[in-house]
């Protein structure tokens, strides 16, 4: 099918250019070489086994550096080859929940504690990338939350009030006319901006961190999937790993591995990328010359930022495909997202989007992560439903520090929010009756807009994770 084009004031507009269905981050792996990690083909033993090479698993592994322990990491794809390496690479504490939603759910003090977790995740990633000079397109980009309509304006105002209530001072709000100074868009009614956030190529980041782990003596086996776990031993297709402690940080956890699979749900989004923008296009997008990572106030929101080589990365979805049980791979969804973007940026109608790819992220019913230690498997910790790179990074570090006995203070602070024993409005078993997509759709909307939580006192007995 050939591209269709039209002309508007001398500009050629190509809204239906055929896009290649391919993860752009995979394409960028051709730029730098990384260590080859063959599959596991023998039986080995270690002190700590980490299953999963996304941001949770890699962050957990990094906690064991220079601890004198034998650490092994296995990944069914390449490190970063699953959800983490298909993401937009936003390093922001915002994910599925805005700060004002956390304040409503938990109160000001608790919301501040929760918000601190992804902020620590960002600090951990950025400091490591800078310390070891890992080349992965790291860019400092302020976050800009964009309101649509009167509801979006109210959300922006609520976010401002909540940021002030928890003590943040770096935020700035914009009305529709003021937004024109920093964003060449139309149709947004308000915005709130804050700093301390970044963009990164997530796949290059994880591959670079993998190389760092290997250089420090860790064993990494790619193309090695966990088939089952029996006490202290994880079985793969061609080998086994027996470990004193095991951290399982995988997405799309199979039911056969653990009933904790019932705690995870999927949200699907789509991403697309353009050719590098010209200087003129960059000035249209960000008139002030300051790059930002942006997202809007829709329930299924659209989001965009620039990459290190000045390509526009644009993502979003639809209410239907977001909650589907199985992956849906069709360019029609991202074309609608692109069409909506062009309605806000008519001067960028001629941008050429060259690649697109879908991705399913793991989430929980209330949109906060779960860290769990199953009864009878006290040496095993699961990390589930971390939406956003900073959240995953913090949770991986947190789980590892619990193994090391170095997280008592953080445990008392965070067990309320991350334990799978916390209160959920709708039970996971309801998914077997009405289906997991419908259950997640209901629970997701409730958590975002209505849920109010009651905090528990720390248990005096054995820790929950």
Question: At which residue positions do the language-model features occur?
Answer:
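Glycine-rich FAD pyrophosphate-binding loop
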Residues: 66-86
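Extreme N-terminal leader/targeting segments of oxidoreductases
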Residues: 1-48
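Dinucleotide-binding Rossmann-like beta1-alpha1 core, especially the glycine-rich loop
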Residues: 94-177
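Active-site substrate-recognition segment that forms the wall
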Residues: 123, 131-139, 226, 240-280, ...
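N-terminal Rossmann-like FAD-binding beta1-loop-alpha1 element of flavoenzymes
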Residues: 48-73
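Helical element adjacent to the flavin cofactor pocket in flavoenzyme catalytic cores
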Residues: 161-162, 186-244
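Helix-loop-beta segment of a Rossmann-like dinucleotide-binding subdomain
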Residues: 135-145, 177-208, 317-320
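C-terminal catalytic lobe of FAD-dependent flavoproteins
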Residues: 320-440, 450
């Amino acid at each position: 099918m050939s591209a269709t084009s039209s002309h508007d004031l001398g500009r050629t507009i190509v809204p239906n250019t055929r896009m290649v269905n391919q993860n752009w981050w995979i394409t960028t792996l051709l730029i730098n070489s990384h260590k080859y990690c063959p599959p596991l083909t023998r039986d080995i033993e270690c002190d700590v086994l980490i299953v999963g090479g996304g941001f949770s698993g890699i962050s957990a592994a990094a906690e064991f550096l220079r601890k004198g322990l034998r650490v092994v990491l296995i990944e069914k794809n390449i490190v970063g080859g699953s959800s983490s390496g298909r993401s937009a690479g936003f390093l922001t504490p915002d994910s599925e929940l805005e700060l004002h939603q956390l304040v409503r759910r938990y109160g000001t003090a608790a919301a501040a504690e929760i918000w601190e977790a992804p902020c620590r995740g960002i600090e951990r990633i950025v400091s490591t990338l800078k310390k070891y000079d890992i080349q992965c397109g790291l860019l400092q980009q302020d976050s800009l939350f964009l309101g649509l309509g009167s509801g979006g304006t109210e959300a922006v105002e609520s976010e401002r009030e909540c940021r002030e209530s928890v003590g943040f001072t770096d935020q700035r709000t914009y009305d529709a006319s003021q937004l024109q100074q920093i964003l060449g868009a139309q149709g947004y009614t308000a915005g709130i901006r804050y700093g301390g956030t970044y963009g990164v190529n997530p796949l290059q980041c994880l591959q670079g961190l993998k190389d760092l782990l290997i250089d420090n003596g860790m064993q990494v086996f790619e193309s090695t999937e966990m088939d089952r776990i029996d006490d202290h031993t994880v079985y793969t297709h061609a080998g086994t790993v027996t470990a004193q402690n095991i951290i399982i940080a995988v997405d799309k956890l199979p039911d056969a591995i653990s009933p904790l699979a019932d705690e995870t749900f999927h949200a699907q989004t789509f991403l697309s990328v353009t050719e590098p923008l010209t200087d003129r296009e960059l000035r249209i997008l960000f008139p002030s010359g300051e790059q930002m990572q942006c997202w809007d106030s829709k329930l299924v929101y659209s989001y965009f930022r620039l990459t290190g080589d000045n390509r526009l990365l644009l993502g979003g979805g639809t209410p239907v495909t977001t909650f589907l049980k199985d992956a849906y791979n069709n360019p029609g969804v991202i074309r609608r997202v692109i069409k909506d973007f062009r309605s806000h940026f008519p001067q960028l109608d001629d941008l050429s989007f060259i690649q697109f790819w879908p991705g399913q992220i793991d989430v929980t019913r209330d949109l906060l992560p779960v860290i769990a230690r199953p009864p009878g498997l006290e040496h095993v910790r699961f990390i589930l439903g971390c939406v956003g790179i900073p959240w995953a990074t913090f949770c991986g570090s947190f789980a590892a520090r619990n193994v090391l006995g170095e997280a008592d203070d953080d445990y008392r602070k965070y067990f309320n929010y991350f334990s799978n024993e916390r209160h959920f409005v709708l039970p996971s078993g309801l998914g077997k009756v009405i289906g997991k997509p419908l259950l997640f759709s209901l629970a997701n909307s409730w958590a975002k807009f209505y849920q109010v939580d009651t905090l528990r006192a720390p248990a005096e007995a054995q820790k929950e994770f």
